[in-house]
Design a protein with these regions (language model features):
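Extracellular beta-rich repeat passengers
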Residues: 1-272
């Protein structure tokens, strides 16, 4: 619920839904990436890329969820689940999106949700799907989705680089709203501006190696800023050695039957 707004969000390898809203959310979002690695790599079939509800117990409960989202790249890993799943009375305004990797890239459910798509209180425009759509109630349809003016495409093969980098020309310009950045293309991450670089990694790309501190040191050693170390049993700083601990170091004593401690002998130093 609520009206929280968000930009530049990456969700990777969630076993449940990558993005999920419910209970009246009416905020705004732009530049969202959901990426699910191949099932053979993960060992499981991820759930929906985006599960979108108003209220599961009372579909028409107010305030009705109706967020505005733009520039989405949603890449799934299983034929058995949905991409964008609109249901439980939700409304939505979704623009400039690419969805692939699911057997049903878009599904609509419940009378309230499909009626909103027909009467214009919900909008789906400039959306490219790698597969078709499914409309449970039969009120909305793939013909409505692809009709002139919506600029939507179904059953279209989409290729990306580095997992999710790439866009499709043509999109809705929402910059009249001060929240939205002008980005009249479909997708979240253009090749000319990969904003995910430098602060995100897909699961399994870089796993931190945690060094154990045990035994003894006879020469100087530095524990490096930003790293984590496991203290395992006795760790002796011998005569003539210096143990330097930089700011931002994390030292974890393992929870087991062994007593963990650092012993600084006479004639040695600790610099922290």
């Amino acid at each position: 619920g609520g009206s929280v707004n968000v930009k530049y969000l990456v969700s990777t390898d969630c076993s449940d839904d990558s993005f999920d809203w419910t209970e009246g959310w009416n905020g705004k979002a732009q530049f969202l990436v959901a990426y699910q690695s191949l099932k053979d790599e993960l060992g499981y079939d991820c759930d929906c890329l985006m599960e979108c509800d108003n209220n599961g117990k009372s579909f028409g409960a107010t305030p009705v969820a109706c967020p505005t989202l733009a520039n989405l790249t949603l890449i799934g890993n299983g034929e058995s689940k949905q991409g964008i799943r609109l249901r439980a009375g939700t409304k939505a305004k979704i623009y400039n999106a690419i969805v692939k990797g699911k057997g049903q890239c878009l599904t609509t459910e419940t009378t309230e949700t499909e009626n909103a798509l027909m009467d214009g209180s919900s909008e789906l425009q400039y959306i490219t799907l790698a597969t078709n759509i499914s409309c449970k109630e039969g009120i909305y349809s793939s013909n409505e989705f692809t009709k002139d003016g919506n600029h939507n495409i179904i059953n279209y093969s989409v290729m990306f680089t580095n997992g999710y980098v790439g866009t499709i020309e043509g999109g809705k310009n929402l910059s009249d709203d001060s929240f939205f950045t002008q980005a009249a293309y479909q997708g979240a991450v253009p090749a000319s501006n990969d904003w995910t670089q430098g602060w995100t990694l897909k699961s399994g790309i870089a796993e931190e190696t945690i060094e154990e501190l045990k035994g003894e040191i006879t020469t100087s050693k530095t524990l490096t800023e930003g790293k984590t170390y496991y203290l395992t049993g006795e760790y002796k700083v011998k005569n003539g050695a210096t143990l330097k601990i930089e700011p931002g170091v994390t030292i974890i004593a393992k929870h087991d039957d062994i007593v963990d401690y650092i012993l600084v002998e006479q004639g040695s130093k600790i610099d922290a």
